[in-house]
């Protein structure tokens, strides 16, 4: 190689050293100094792994003093390059910059610069980069983005609500589905969409204290959203890092009590600039015109400051009209400001509901009915649609569906309230109760008597709680030596049941963690029964492992022993046998227990087994729940109301279970109250609201479409390719499970989203639902999204060289494969990627500028190529550098037409979609006051900003592959 003192070269193998300078040489060796690191390297002159750094007219370079030069001309003087051009900071022309004075920290970011500087990537990395660009662009344009990546069953009514609400600007809605229909999942889907699209970045979830961990687990396990749990300790700790502790995290969960009991803390919450507020159990916010509760006022303050609000609540019929109005008032105080007016409005929606029922019935409509429909919809050009709906034509059903949709839009609260009932949603199992009456052991009788004497001053409520758990009373007196499980007949019954049902999975729930732990030991030691334990003292990871062991079909645990609190938020639909070792204190907890199995998607009827001890509070409670509330075999929306009204009497019977006088009358009274309330709730059902909420056929199609996307084989191939190139170890464990672990030779030392000890993944939704320890990999999973970012945000795979063995072409024939990216820069919340995601445009040019890309498909072509080592590649580049420059210029002239076409299409699509949505809502605003002014203003502003950003869209070269034809 011809070396001269002062020349600048770059190492092919250690590009991180920066630019080197030739400082010494003899007949055989050359020494380079790399000023940016202060290191020297000695190379053999004949075959050194270095590449001469040479810039061309049009490039911009930096001097060692920091100023930049736009090159107009390149001269050579005594083997050294001199660059002549315009200095950018002073705009002085004909400035010279000798190569020896170039900045040594020079970074080559453009693909062509990296290629000419010898920074040549492996061929497989170039292919990965192109695929990443292609798939990322496709995924941005896919419908239902944000709905595909969650670890949930594809349940139509949930998807319908999430799809509708998740795409809105700052949604403010009430989610009021009946228990077991998945309000938490609906809220999570909405959050996932809003965060993924950039519509929201900061989210606050406020829940009752007992549900904090449930939400934390659900958001992480189902949606890969890592929330921070704020309590007193975390709040105090965060005060050291920021004036407002809540600004230290983007996603926060806290309890309602934590939020409201400290004035400064509430102010900090209000000042933290959240994008979305989620409030669970919002029906506990007590409100009246004269005296709203402190909890209600705290949420009201937040709702005034946060643009998007999701309230999760019991059904409106359970709440009562005034309480229901109070929730709507939080969402839109301008719209819902007068309770009396609201009551009147609700009455006026009956004709709309009747009209929808009429259309759904499918019968021919009379002229009066057609006229009434026309009046309700109130649009001038509605006549053809009415005629089509009332005809025998093929499009009659479509016309009826459209009329129903138009009526829905005009329905008073259909945009702010979503409510599904079990009657309106199919797919729930039956519940069958099996009670097992067992004798009260003498040991317990003695302990209860002594406890009664010693606890004479206890309140009736405390005595009632004690009487529910006689083993706890016994343990208090006997201490650690009290082996209650040796004589408690419930233990014998449980062992007998499990041994006679060895092939069935059984969930056992008891109130206390200690009970669960003691039962596990007994089952294991006495009968060798494989039992997993699940309680609040375990970490989330430990609970995951226990749940995964329980989920394993062949070698897994037969039984899972859960404590009351530990089981919150976990669902085990793959099991259908539930044993309640004891009973919870109120109907809500009873429903929560059954709800672990009684979920939509449960494939079998649920067998509920209740072994109870006679003459204890358990015997009282089992009768009251079953005979008084019918709470075991059916969901009980009336349970809390009746529990509150019968509380005093019930407590006395629980505290003194042997005194049964009048108990039958109490049960009868509660049952009558239950039937009356239930009939009242049924009569008050808003059928129109249910139709709107469950989505009908449209929701079914949505679920089916996402299910079809689940079968995308491109994802598996791409993910494996990505993991290989990044350097992540993959161990196939069978059953569609793969274990990923970091290796010692990864592309980056710490791959975001991959734990140090690795993780188990699956591409199958069904497997992910049954194995909580396995992460469900989709295009929306952080591992894939982080992998795409890792490849595309850097220069991995942006320049490479390949050989094409093809005897039909002359040896030395040169082809250049160019990948341009057409893109627009804009704030994430504009969601510009809906219209113009970063879009790759591939070109395959010969030296005459002929583009062969359409004739030569990428994957087919890529398989015909072979790799070149970096050293040989650098020599090839130097030999054909001038030809490559010429081809690049031809590429620049050709890309403009393709890019302009993409940008124009994106502009047209954005204008049509956003203008259409704005026009639709403006028209509806005249007949439905629930469409907010700020929502209309936001859509209009969004449209203008999107179109302006698309006007400024451009393109750039993202990757480059040089291909040389060989016959060997």
From Swiss-Prot:
| Positions occupied by motif DEAH box | 280-283
Residues annotated as binding ATP: 177-184
Q: Which residues form the Helicase C-terminal domain?
A: 490-685
Question: Which proteins does it associate with, and in what oligomeric form?
Answer: Interacts with the RNAP. Has a higher affinity for the core RNAP than for the holoenzyme. Its ATPase activity is stimulated by binding to RNAP.
| Keyword terms, alphabetized | Activator, ATP-binding, DNA-binding, Helicase, Hydrolase, Nucleotide-binding, Transcription, Transcription regulation
Q: What is this protein called?
A: RNA polymerase-associated protein RapA
Gene3D superfamilies xrefs: 2.30.30.140, 2.30.30.930, 3.30.360.80, 6.10.140.1500, 6.10.140.2230, P-loop containing nucleotide triphosphate hydrolases (3.40.50.300), Tandem AAA-ATPase domain (3.40.50.10810)
Q: Which residues form the signal peptide?
A: none
Matching entries from PANTHER family are given as:
DNA ANNEALING HELICASE AND ENDONUCLEASE ZRANB3 FAMILY MEMBER, SWI_SNF-RELATED MATRIX-ASSOCIATED ACTIN-DEPENDENT REGULATOR OF CHROMATIN SUBFAMILY A-LIKE PROTEIN 1
The record's listing under PROSITE patterns reads: HELICASE_ATP_BIND_1, HELICASE_CTER
In terms of NCBIfam families, this protein maps to:
PRK04914.1
Q: Enumerate the Gene Ontology biological process terms.
A: regulation of DNA-templated transcription
Query: Where is the Helicase ATP-binding domain positioned along the sequence?
Result: 164-334
Q: Which Pfam families match?
A: Helicase_C (PF00271), RapA_C (PF12137), SNF2-rel_dom (PF00176), Tudor_1_RapA (PF18339), Tudor_RapA (PF18337)
Read off the HAMAP family from this record: Helicase_RapA
The free-text function statement in the UniProt record for this protein reads: Transcription regulator that activates transcription by stimulating RNA polymerase (RNAP) recycling in case of stress conditions such as supercoiled DNA or high salt concentrations. Probably acts by releasing the RNAP, when it is trapped or immobilized on tightly supercoiled DNA. Does not activate transcription on linear DNA. Probably not involved in DNA repair.
Q: What is its EC number?
A: 3.6.4.-
Q: Which family does it belong to?
A: Belongs to the SNF2/RAD54 helicase family. RapA subfamily.
Q: List the molecular function annotations (GO) for this entry.
A: ATP binding; DNA binding; helicase activity; hydrolase activity, acting on acid anhydrides
Q: Encoded by which gene?
A: rapA
């Amino acid at each position: 190689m011809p070396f001269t003192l002062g020349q600048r070269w770059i190492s092919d193998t250690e590009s991180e050293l920066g630019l080197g300078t030739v400082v010494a040489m003899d007949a055989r060796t050359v020494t380079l100094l790399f000023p940016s690191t202060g290191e020297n390297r000695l190379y053999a002159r004949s075959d050194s792994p270095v590449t001469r750094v040479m810039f061309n007219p049009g490039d911009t370079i930096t001097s060692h003093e920091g100023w930049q030069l736009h090159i107009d001309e390149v001269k050579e003087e005594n083997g050294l390059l001199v660059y002549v051009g315009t200095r950018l900071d002073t705009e002085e022309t004909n400035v010279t910059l000798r190569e020896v004075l170039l900045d040594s920290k020079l970074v080559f970011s453009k693909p062509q610069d990296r290629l000419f500087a010898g920074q040549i990537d492996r061929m497989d990395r170039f292919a990965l980069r192109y695929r990443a660009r292609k798939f990322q662009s496709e995924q941005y344009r896919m419908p239902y983005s944000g709905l595909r990546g969650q670890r949930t069953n594809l349940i139509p009514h949930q998807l319908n609500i999430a799809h509708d609400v998740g795409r809105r600007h700052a949604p403010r809605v009430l989610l009021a589905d009946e228990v077991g229909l998945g309000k938490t999942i609906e809220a999570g889907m909405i959050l996932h969409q809003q965060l993924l699209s950039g519509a929201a970045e900061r989210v606050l979830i406020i829940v009752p204290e007992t549900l904090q961990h449930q939400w934390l687990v659900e958001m992480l396990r189902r949606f890969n959203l890592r929330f921070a749990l704020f309590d007193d300790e975390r709040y105090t700790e965060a005060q050291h890092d920021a004036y407002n502790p809540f600004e230290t995290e983007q996603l926060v969960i806290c309890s309602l009590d934590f939020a409201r009991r400290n004035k400064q803390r509430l102010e900090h919450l209000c000042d933290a600039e959240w994008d979305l507020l989620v409030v669970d159990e919002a029906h506990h916010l007590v409100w009246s015109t004269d005296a709203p509760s402190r909890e209600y006022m705290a949420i009201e303050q937040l709702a005034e400051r946060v643009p998007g609000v999701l309230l999760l609540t019991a059904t409106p019929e359970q709440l009562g009209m005034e309480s229901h109005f109070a929730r709507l008032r939080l969402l839109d105080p301008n719209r819902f400001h007068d309770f009396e007016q609201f009551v009147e409005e609700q009455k006026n929606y009956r004709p709309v509901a009747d009209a929808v029922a009429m259309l759904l019935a499918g019968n021919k409509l009379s002229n009066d009915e057609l006229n009434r429909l026309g009046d309700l919809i109130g649009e001038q050009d509605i006549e053809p649609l009415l005629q089509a709906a009332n005809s025998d034509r093929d499009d009659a059903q479509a016309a009826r569906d459209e009329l129903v949709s138009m009526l829905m839009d005009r329905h008073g609260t259909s945009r702010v309230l979503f409510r599904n009932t079990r009657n309106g949603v199919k797919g729930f199992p039956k519940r069958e109760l099996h009670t097992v009456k067992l004798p009260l052991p003498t040991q317990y009788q003695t302990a209860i008597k002594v406890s009664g004497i010693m606890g004479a001053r206890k309140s009736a409520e405390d005595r009632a709680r004690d009487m529910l758990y006689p083993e706890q009373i016994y343990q208090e007196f006997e201490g650690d030596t009290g082996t209650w499980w040796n004589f408690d007949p419930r233990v014998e019954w449980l062992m007998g049941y499990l041994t006679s049902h060895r092939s069935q999975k059984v969930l056992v729930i008891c109130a206390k963690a200690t009970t669960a732990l003691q039962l596990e030991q007994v089952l294991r030691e006495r009968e060798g029964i494989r039992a997993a334990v699940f309680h609040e003292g375990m970490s989330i990871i430990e609970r995951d492992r226990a749940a995964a062991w329980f989920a394993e079909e062949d070698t897994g645990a037969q039984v899972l022993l859960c404590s009351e609190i530990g089981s919150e938020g976990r669902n085990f639909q793959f099991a259908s046998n539930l044993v309640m070792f004891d009973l919870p204190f109120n109907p809500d907890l009873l429903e929560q227990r059954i709800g672990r199995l009684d979920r939509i998607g449960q494939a079998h009827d649920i067998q509920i087994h209740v072994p109870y001890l006679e003459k204890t509070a358990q015997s009282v409670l089992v009768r009251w729940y079953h005979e008084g509330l019918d709470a075991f075999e059916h969901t009980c929306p009336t349970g809390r109301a009746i529990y509150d009204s019968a509380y005093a009497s019930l407590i006395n019977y629980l505290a003194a279970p042997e005194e049964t006088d009048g108990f039958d009358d109490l049960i009868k009274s509660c049952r009558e109250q239950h039937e009356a309330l239930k009939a009242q709730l049924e009569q008050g059902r808003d059928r129109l609201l249910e139709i709107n909420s469950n989505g009908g056929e449209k929701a079914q199609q949505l679920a089916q479409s996402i299910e079809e996307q689940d079968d995308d084989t491109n994802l598996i191939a791409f993910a494996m390719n990505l993991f290989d190139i990044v350097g992540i170890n993959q161990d196939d464990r069978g059953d569609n499970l793969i274990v990923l672990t970091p290796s010692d030779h990864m592309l980056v030392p710490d791959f975001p989203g991959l734990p140090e000890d690795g993780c188990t993944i699956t591409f199958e939704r069904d497997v992910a639902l049954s194995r909580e320890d396995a992460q469900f990999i989709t295009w929306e999973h952080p591992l894939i999204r982080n992998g795409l970012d890792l490849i595309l945000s850097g220069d991995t795979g942006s320049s490479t060289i390949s050989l094409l063995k093809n005897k039909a072409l002359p040896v030395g024939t040169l082809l250049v494969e160019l990948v341009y990216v057409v893109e627009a820069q804009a704030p994430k919340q504009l969601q510009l990627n809906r219209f113009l995601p970063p879009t790759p445009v591939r070109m395959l040019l010969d030296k005459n500028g002929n583009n062969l890309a359409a004739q030569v498909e990428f994957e087919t072509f890529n398989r015909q190529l072979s790799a070149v080592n970096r050293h040989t590649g650098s020599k090839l580049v130097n030999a054909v550098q001038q030809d490559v420059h010429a081809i690049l210029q031809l590429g620049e002239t050709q890309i403009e037409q393709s890019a302009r076409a993409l940008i124009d299409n994106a502009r047209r699509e954005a204008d049509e979609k956003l203008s259409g949505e704005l026009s639709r809502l403006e028209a509806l605003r005249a007949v439905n006051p629930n469409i907010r002014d700020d929502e209309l203003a936001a859509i209009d502003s969004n449209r203008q900003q999107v179109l302006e950003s698309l006007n400024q869209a451009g393109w750039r070269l993202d990757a480059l592959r040089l291909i040389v034809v060989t016959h060997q």
